[in-house]
Amino acid sequence: MSKVASKLNLRQVGRVCVTVADTDRAIDFYVGTLGFEKVVDTPMGPDMRWVEVALHGTPTTIALAPPPQGQGAGGSQTGIILDTSDVDADHAALKAAGVDVDDEVTRFGGPVPPMFWLRDPDGNSLIIVQPSA
């Protein structure tokens, strides 16, 4: 362990942040479509809100935040990976609901699990993966 690391008090990944142009639209997508729960919704200055959503029973949240001043919202590869027990069923359900998903589930084979990408209404990409049992 490095000299710096031994002095730190880090304990978990608490939240990740995606920028969104319309907070209510993002809440509708993450809560209404993906099944997250809204766990934080608080004013952030006179015109903005800080919102966090999480999957039921999980400690890590996704913050749905406005972009920094002068920057656009969304359009990023978030690096967020959501685990599922049935990647094919989730892909079919999201595609049928009109969510922007890849045309097919990607299957690389070997130790790489099946997966597909989806994009939220702001173009932020998330990956849904079915880990090996």
Identify the residue ranges that each predicted region occupies.
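Core segments of cupin and vicinal oxygen chelate
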Residues: 8-10, 17-60
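Residue-level recognition of conserved beta-strand positions in structured domain cores
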Residues: 55, 64-66, 130
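Vicinal oxygen chelate
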Residues: 1-9, 15-18, 41-42, 49, ...
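Short, charged/polar surface micro-motifs in flexible loops or helix N-caps
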Residues: 56-61, 69-71, 87-89
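Short, P/G- and charge-enriched loop/turn segments at secondary-structure junctions
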Residues: 4, 39, 67-70
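Helix-adjacent hinge/juxtasegments
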Residues: 66, 73-74, 80-84
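Short amphipathic alpha-helices within nucleic acid-binding modules
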Residues: 29, 88-93
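Helix N-cap motif at beta-to-alpha junctions
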Residues: 22-23, 84-88
